[in-house]
Amino acid sequence: AWSSAIPVERYTAADSLGANKSHRAYYTTTKDFQTFAPAKAFYDPGFNSIDGFIVKRDKNDYVLIIKDNRKPGYSDLFCVSGPSAEGPYTSPSTKFAPTYSEGPCAVKVGDEWLIYFDVYREGRFGAVATKDFKTFTPIDNQISIPQGHKHGTIIKVPESVLLNLKAEEAKRFPQKD
């Protein structure tokens, strides 16, 4: 999936709240990475929305974490759920991150989901913990993100890969006392 500006004439002026473009998430499908189906709107809540991240909680249970990008000064993160990655999705949750947050990424740790996000106007990362994607507990004071880091994704790798990366980091950036 990707987000893009589309011609505003496709939407009403009230939809974009005075902005001269509308942002939506799109997707395509492929079986061979040579030919692709025509692009389709992925999630369209009727207002500018970008930076989606999908979580599969269980069979037929997906959560989309996405940015409400309606107008300058209004960029909040919210969650919607649905029976498949393609939706249809429910009504949005309440916002759970500071205004001016974007680029969400989630990872399951134990019985909680940790959602990380870029609080871009403050030049920092924030995070919340949730079990149900309806109630959120801030955990900013429990995370450490490298200075200058922006949007990111968390992936699982074998421990050997992690150890090799840490060894390479130690060679390239030795600690100074």
Regions found by a protein language model. Give the residues of each.
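Beta-rich carbohydrate-recognition and catalytic domains
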Residues: A1-G103, K108-D177
